[in-house]
Amino acid sequence: MKVLVDIDEYAEGAVLLDGLESAIVGIVQEFGNGNRVLYSKQRILEILQERDLMTMGEAEEFYDYNILGLYAGEQNAVFLDQSLEPIKNKENEWEYHAK
């Protein structure tokens, strides 16, 4: 059963990015600080390309300067970059490869 959650109540005071609601993937909890909204970087880049007709390069530049670079207080949004893939090497140690 899915439960509808009001992000404003669940992460009261957290910064929400207008127009990027479909890129929300979760809530980050940090001891001593309020909850923050977690966005998928890859989904944000897809939205910018689809909605705003940006190239990947334009979307990445816009993301870096206008979204990642935004500071709106202690409950600023945080971003998940899933471009690394953990793989065990022959010595049974973890290595990380770009997807």
Label the predicted regions.
Residues 1-99:
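C-terminal alpha-helical interaction appendages
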